[in-house]
């Protein structure tokens, strides 16, 4: 969309942070208003992450106004909230392309802009990276400042606390800004906090604080009295004791929507030495009433009409695989009170809303804590319960040692319901579910299942739930099911595939939900088609039978070729000295960028036309 200068006259003056810093203070509230309206106008036309960015408009303006970015280094955690940052750093006219194929990256991305210091997408990484960047800046000796912005959800993760503990030990010069959009601030308390925060962050207070420490360091009673007095003053504002104990100078909470107040506080804190912590209060969805009332629904949005405030409703077509999982979960829980379901802050995305309402005492949202989620499940299994960990493929990576050490080694019956497996689309490199088959397949005692449709998905969930000899995993994609009939639940024979079509010369071994496209290829080439179902254990007898009766084999999966299901087939053939040509079709050896699932599958040759072309070229 073209930029309307008349509609956004102040924002039109800002196409870089250098231009932003030329604006007088009194024009900044108007800039924030225009930036918020432009964000609404852009995202409603193009889709994208929405509510988080509305809540960080004033913070973004204040940070770029006070700090000399990009020389000073600003790090955003996760990046959902960074759309205003992109708009102010030379990408205003491209914001309508965000999350689209060939467009702006959905998160801060180092290859896109010098303002994007850290490529992000997963949570809770900013402080760790920020410490490293701050240490490097100190050694560089150019007085380069480091700022990390982290949300109240991301800061609950263990990695964030590990980083803060380290920062308190080595004491780098850096600022951590906690963007807290969970609490509401009353006008009076907010005003008091803002005033005290400015006092506590000011140079006079800082000088008195450090000078007093030096003067009275040899007089323990007075030193202790001063420390307690300072704690009491800060206690009038908020209980920031935890961050103080970790070694940070804590300031806040302050109103995150008062841009001029933020600028004053940030200027005061900019030159303070050691690790600093600024706690700001914001409202997710700020300035757009529907998003303020329902920030979860408006977290990421499709195209919508901002005047109505209504998001387009589902067409009522086929259910998503997440819905299939959620329905199975409720159905099974109603029959078995030993079922326990765990999610690391992905209730809506994993299809668990209904379960959380029907079975609240058996539903555990552990927040952004994937490592804890898996070991918590291990403990439930030891206690005689039947835990199910519902988790995205890309986030299970964060708990790999826990899967190995706490679940698999002990042969605990934990079921992993792995959503968003394969290509996920608009969130790009950081969110593709490209690696789960590779990183799980090498774990002893693990059963791995790849359904080809929603009925198989249900049967495999049922099979994994009743498998008591160790952990099991069922992986399924983002998107809708294919519309097959749902049959009564029954346990599948472990490690057994089925032949779907008999052909000649060529056999295609399919793993997972690319089956509809693979079936078209098999029909076109008159190839035998096998639904392998299990990646581990593989149906070795069936593989050897197919190798003996066909001239060539093709494996198909929506996972990295390296170490994936096809690699497992290769290993079986080599172990049995079967010199049969094999073509492995799957995800290539690079990080898959954003685009719709259909666009990326076509580009990577994972639609029917692409697979057929690959096979014909290989056979030629």
UniProtKB/Swiss-Prot annotation:
Pathway assignment: Metabolic intermediate biosynthesis; 1-deoxy-D-xylulose 5-phosphate biosynthesis; 1-deoxy-D-xylulose 5-phosphate from D-glyceraldehyde 3-phosphate and pyruvate: step 1/1
Full protein name: 1-deoxy-D-xylulose-5-phosphate synthase
EC number: 2.2.1.7
Cofactor(s), names only, from the UniProt record: Mg(2+); thiamine diphosphate
Catalytic activity: D-glyceraldehyde 3-phosphate + pyruvate + H(+) = 1-deoxy-D-xylulose 5-phosphate + CO2
InterPro entries, per the entry: Dxylulose-5-P_synthase (IPR005477), THDP-binding (IPR029061), Transketo_C/PFOR_II (IPR009014), Transketolase-like_Pyr-bd (IPR005475), Transketolase_BS (IPR020826), Transketolase_C (IPR033248), Transketolase_CS (IPR049557)
Organism whose genome encodes this protein: Shigella flexneri
HAMAP family assigned to the protein according to its UniProt record, in alphabetical order: DXP_synth
GO MF annotation list: 1-deoxy-D-xylulose-5-phosphate synthase activity; magnesium ion binding; thiamine pyrophosphate binding
Entry similarity comment: Belongs to the transketolase family. DXPS subfamily.
GO biological process, one term: terpenoid biosynthetic process
Known partners and oligomeric status: Homodimer.
Coiled coil region boundaries: none
Lineage, opening ranks: Bacteria, Pseudomonadati, Pseudomonadota, Gammaproteobacteria, Enterobacterales
Superkingdom in the source lineage: Bacteria
GO cellular-component term (any): cytosol
Binding site for Mg(2+): 152, 181
EC category: transferase
UniProt remark on cofactor binding: Binds 1 Mg(2+) ion per subunit.
Residues that hold thiamine diphosphate according to the record: 80, 121-123, 153-154, 181, 288, 370
Record key words, sorted: Isoprene biosynthesis, Magnesium, Metal-binding, Thiamine biosynthesis, Thiamine pyrophosphate, Transferase
Functional note: Catalyzes the acyloin condensation reaction between C atoms 2 and 3 of pyruvate and glyceraldehyde 3-phosphate to yield 1-deoxy-D-xylulose-5-phosphate (DXP).
């Amino acid at each position: 969309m073209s930029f309307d200068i008349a509609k956004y006259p102040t924002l039109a003056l800002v196409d870089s942070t250098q231009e932003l810093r030329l604006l007088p203070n009194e024009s900044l509230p108007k800039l924030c208003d225009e930036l918020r309206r432009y964000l609404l106008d852009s995202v409603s036309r193009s889709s994208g992450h929405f509510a988080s960015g509305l809540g960080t408009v004033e913070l973004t303006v204040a940070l770029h106004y006070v700090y000399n970015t990009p020389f000073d280094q600003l790090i955003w955690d996760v990046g959902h909230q960074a759309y205003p940052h992109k708009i102010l750093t030379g990408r205003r006219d491209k914001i309508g392309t965000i999350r689209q194929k060939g467009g702006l990256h959905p998160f801060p991305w180092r290859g896109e802009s010098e303002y994007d210091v850290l490529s992000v997408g997963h949570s809770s990484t900013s402080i760790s990276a920020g410490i490293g960047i701050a240490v490097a800046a100190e050694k560089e000796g150019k007085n380069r400042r480091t700022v990390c912005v982290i949300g109240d959800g991301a800061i609950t993760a263990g990695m964030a606390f590990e980083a803060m503990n380290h920062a308190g030990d080595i004491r780098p010069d850096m600022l951590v800004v906690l963007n807290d959009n969970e609490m509401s601030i009353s006008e009076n308390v907010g005003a008091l906090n803002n005033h005290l925060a400015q006092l506590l962050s000011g140079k006079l207070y800082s000088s008195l604080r450090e000078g007093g420490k030096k003067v009275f360091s040899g007089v323990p009673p007075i030193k202790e009295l001063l420390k307690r007095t300072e704690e009491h003053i800060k206690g009038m504002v908020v209980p920031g004791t935890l961050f103080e104990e970790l070694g940070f100078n804590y300031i806040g909470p302050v109103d995150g929507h008062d841009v001029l107040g933020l600028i004053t506080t940030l200027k005061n804190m900019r030159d303070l030495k050691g690790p600093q912590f600024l706690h700001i209060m914001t409202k997710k969805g700020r300035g757009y009433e529907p998003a303020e009332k329902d920030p979860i629904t408006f977290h990421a949005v499709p195209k919508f009409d901002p005047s109505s405030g209504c998001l387009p409703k589902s067409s009522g077509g086929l259910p998503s695989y997440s819905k299939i999982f959620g329905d199975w979960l409720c159905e099974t829980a109603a029959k078995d009170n030993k079922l326990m379901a765990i999610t690391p802050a992905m209730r809506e995305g994993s299809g668990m809303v209904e379960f959380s309402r029907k079975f609240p005492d058996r539903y555990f949202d552990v927040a952004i804590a994937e490592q804890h989620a898996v070991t918590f499940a291990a403990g439930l299994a030891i206690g005689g319960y039947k835990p199910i960990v519902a988790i995205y493929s890309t986030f299970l990576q964060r708990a790999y040692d826990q899967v190995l050490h706490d679940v698999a080694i002990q042969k605990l019956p934990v079921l992993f319901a792995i959503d968003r497996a394969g290509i996920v689309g608009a969130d790009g490199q950081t969110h593709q579910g490209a690696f789960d088959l590779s990183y799980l397949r090498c774990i002893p005692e693990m059963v791995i299942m790849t359904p080809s449709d929603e009925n198989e998905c249900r049967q495999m969930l049922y099979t994994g739930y009743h498998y008591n000899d160790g952990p099991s995993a069922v992986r399924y994609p983002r998107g809708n099911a294919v519309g097959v009939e749902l049959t009564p639940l029954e346990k599948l024979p472990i490690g057994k595939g089925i032949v779907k079509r008999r052909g000649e010369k060529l056999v295609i071994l399919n793993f997972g939900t690319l089956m509809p496209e693979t079936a078209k290829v098999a029909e076109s080439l008159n190839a035998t088609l096998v639904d392998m179902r299990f990646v581990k254990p593989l149906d070795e007898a069936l593989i050897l039978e197919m190798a003996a009766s066909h001239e060539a084999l093709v494996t198909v999966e929506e996972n990295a070729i390296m170490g994936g299901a096809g690699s497992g087939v290769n290993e079986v053939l080599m172990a049995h000295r079967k010199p049969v040509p094999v073509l492995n079709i799957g995800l290539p050896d690079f990080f898959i960028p954003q685009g719709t699932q259909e666009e990326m599958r076509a580009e990577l040759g994972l639609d029917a036309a692409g697979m057929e072309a690959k096979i014909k070229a290989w056979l030629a």
